[in-house]
């Protein structure tokens, strides 16, 4: 059976999505359309690029030369600031508005310049300046480099995989996979669904990068002119962040067949829809194996904990109405007690998360034998359900009034 798959966002917890898909593939099922947000966007990209569940598992459990999870490097130090960021950025302008009346002007301005430059060179102060100037405490440069490398690694249909430089239109032509990535345009105040229809000139790797850009954690992405328009609308210079800000689990986009939604998602396929949800309310059984040491240093602990708390709270606001309306289409993968940015996850904790996801998928498939469904539903829709999907999907995709 081919399923149209929706992958929820959840940061480091997203490895559970791979464990669940592993079971789906083992039981002979495959995918049609793919839709992902944040960590779900990463999973969708790898599937569309031809990675098997085993290959994805190997990639997502990689460790560096020091034995640390490669994902831990994704919270990288900010790259050096430009002279413009230091001399004319938001922080320097803020200082410029503070008048130190007891210091002569010819001394005050150079002093403020020196202070800003010192902050830009510091440790945590450098992260603070990155948050002010770039919208994120950490840099995602290492993630982007990693994703590019993986999109060019191995083979696809017997040929070297070479997807890293492709646009979304080129990627669709090369693979034939209808894949979409959710992001949020904070400048325009709207949800973006990035695919070969809506943003054909957008680079594949940046579509994924934008989808996973958790606000305040990673630096924002600014839409470039050479990425072309979004749905024929110029959004050059707009700030784009994680799609989970507006909807972390937009399953209704695959259920709805409203004309406005179809213009974004394309025509519905004769595949049942299946959403993989990371359920923070469902506890994960105790880890198997020996406990691993904590890799975060004490100096970083309070900052990391605060950011984790903020991010987990923000992205924990689930699309409850959608999940309740389409409960039969949702596989709830236990993720209770796991953090969105727990990229230093120990091997025993990771194994426990994967085991729980596999068990949840097996239980779902046993209870929901697959049935062909042109409606996108695994069974005939209850009265009003399709109308609800149309309403929710249209509301999500409609840009705000000027």
Q: Where in this protein do the model-derived segments appear?
A:
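Patatin-like phospholipase
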Residues: 1-37, 45-402
């Amino acid at each position: 059976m081919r399923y149209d798959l929706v992958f929820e966002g959840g940061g480091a917890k997203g490895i559970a999505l791979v464990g669940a898909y592993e079971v789906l593939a083992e039981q002979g099922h495959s995918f049609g359309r793919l839709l992902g947000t944040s960590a779900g966007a990463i999973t969708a990209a790898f599937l569309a690029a031809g990675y098997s569940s085993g290959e994805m598992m190997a990639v997502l459990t990689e460790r560096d030369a020091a034995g640390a999870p490669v994902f831990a490097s994704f919270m990288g130090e900010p790259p050096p600031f430009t002279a413009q960021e230091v001399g004319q950025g938001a922080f320097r302008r803020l200082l410029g508005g503070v008048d130190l009346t007891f210091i002569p002007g010819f001394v005050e301005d150079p002093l403020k310049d020196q202070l800003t430059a010192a902050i830009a060179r510091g440790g945590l102060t450098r992260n603070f300046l990155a948050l002010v100037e770039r919208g994120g405490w950490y840099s995602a440069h290492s993630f982007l480099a990693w994703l590019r490398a993986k999109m060019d690694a191995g083979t696809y249909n017997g040929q070297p995989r070479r997807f890293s430089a492709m646009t979304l239109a080129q990627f669709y032509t090369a693979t034939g996979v209808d894949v979409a990535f959710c992001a949020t345009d904070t400048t325009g105040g709207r949800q973006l669904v990035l695919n070969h229809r809506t943003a054909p000139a957008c680079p594949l790797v940046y579509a994924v990068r934008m989808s996973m850009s958790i606000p305040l954690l990673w630096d924002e992405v600014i839409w470039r002119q050479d990425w072309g328009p979004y749905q024929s609308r110029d959004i050059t210079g707009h700030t784009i962040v994680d799609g989970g800000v507006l909807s972390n689990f937009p399953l209704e986009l695959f259920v709805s067949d409203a004309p406005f939604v179809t213009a974004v998602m394309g025509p519905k396929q004769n595949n049942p829809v299946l959403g993989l949800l990371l359920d923070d309310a469902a506890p994960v059984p105790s880890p198997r194996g020996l406990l691993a040491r904590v890799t975060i240093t004490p100096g970083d602990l309070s900052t990391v904990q605060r950011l984790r708390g903020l991010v987990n709270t923000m992205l924990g606001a689930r699309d409850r109405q959608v999940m309740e309306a389409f409960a039969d289409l949702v596989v709830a993968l236990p993720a209770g007690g796991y953090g969105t940015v727990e990229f230093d996850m120990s091997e025993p904790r990771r194994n426990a998360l994967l085991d729980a996801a596999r068990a949840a998928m097996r239980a779902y498939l046993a209870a929901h034998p697959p049935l062909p469904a042109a409606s996108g539903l695994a069974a005939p829709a209850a009265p009003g359900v399709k109308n609800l999907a149309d309403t929710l999907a249209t509301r999500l995709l409609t840009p705000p009034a000027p």
